[in-house]
Structure formats: structure tokens, C-alpha cells
Amino acid sequence: ACHSRFAAKNHGMVEKFEEEVRAARGDIQVRRIGYYDGGQLRGYVAYRFESASDSNYTQNRLSVEELVYEDGAVLRALLGALRLQEDLAQTVILRTGEEDFHHLLDDPQDISKNYIDYGFLQTNVSAIGTMFKLVDGEMFVEKTAYRTFPAGTLTAAFRYRDEMADCEKCLRIAFDGGRWAVAVADSTADVTVICRQGDLASLLMGSCGLEAMLRLGAATADNDEKARELARLLHYGQKPWLNSDY
């Protein structure tokens, strides 16, 4: 139930399969700390100890495999529990989808101590997820009709090349009343965006911003004003993140 609530509140997360739950119960190498409030589990952290040196057995690191929390107070409590393990491990490896996670730390610099020109300190290693792929754009929009968008009325056409079918396609989406839907094929588009199929998936999932894609030349639009409005409609406050193996 705790993980289900976490998945429902965080963009991109999915429910655990029964196989994952059974595997977790049998994995004796992973330790878990739970946060309970009124008898209800409101968060937990799953971690394992790993050797951090080939020549010094006293050097260890703590690798966090799961960090589930219902709010910031629970998160801070779980991080405090990890801090109590500092006599057993000198460093901690955390995986998170929160871009601003380093603001929780008094010193945001990671253990690399890398300095990046000019005046930048390395805080983390970033990675691109490969879980979310767009195979059928129209079906994706239909199945996610429940999503809430900012207020606005606009019809957008996305032109891209379907790499699997080896043909050009056009996905028309109508935004109205805080929802989106597949627009009729002959509807007039307020703005037409041309991009790659993979970038379209990122745009529709909220993994990237349309304005950045236009600045970089990764996408083009035929109406600058409407493109800015479309960027506002597509923007979501949290980028998708998934901590499940697949």
C-alpha cells in the first residue's frame, strides 16, 4: 500500500509486480528501514552494503536500491536513518528522479570533488532512462485522457518519422478544458511541430521541454507564439522516473 501511494503521486512510477514483491522477501542481502506513523507504513528505504575498495576491507559504501516516501518529512527521517550507518559505510549511493535533490544537502558536491569550468561543482551523475517508448501515439493519448493539463485551447500537429513502419506520420492533439484528446484527421492545427519519434515520446511524457528542443534545433515549429503556448500546456512539474527493472 505504501509503494502504491508513492507510485500514484509520482510521475512515471509503476506498481510492483508480484514477482518483484516475492524477490524482495527472499533477498537477504538487502536491508530495509521503514517509517511508521500511527501504525501505517509511510515510507521505507532498501539498501545493501558494498565494498568500496579492492585492497581495504574497512572501506564500504551503502547502495540505496529503493527510497519510497509520502512527503518531505518522511524522506528526511529516512535519510537520517542512513546517516546513522556512517560508522559502517563511508559513502552512500542514491538513485533519485528528483533533479533538485542536492538542495537537501549542506554540501551538494559529490565525492568526486570534480570542478567544472567555470565555477561549477559536480553534484551527481545523470542518466537517460530508456523505459518509456512511443509506439502508437494516438493510443497513448487515448489511454491517458485522464491527465490534467493547464487551461487552454489549442490544436497541435506533431510530424515525425515512424522508424519501425518506415513512414512519415502526423499526430494531431486537441487541448481543451484541461484535457487532451486525439484531434480529427482534417482539423486545422494552430501549430505544427516536426521532431523525431523518440523526442516526441519525451515531449508527451514531460521528460523534456518543447522550448528547449526548439532552442537546440531538435524540433521545429511553424508558429513561435503558439509553440510557446503548447510548451506551457505540455509542461509538468515533475519529470518521469522509474526505479523498476525491466
Question: Locations of the language-model features?
Answer:
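Intrinsically disordered, low-complexity, positively biased terminal segments
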Residues: 1-246
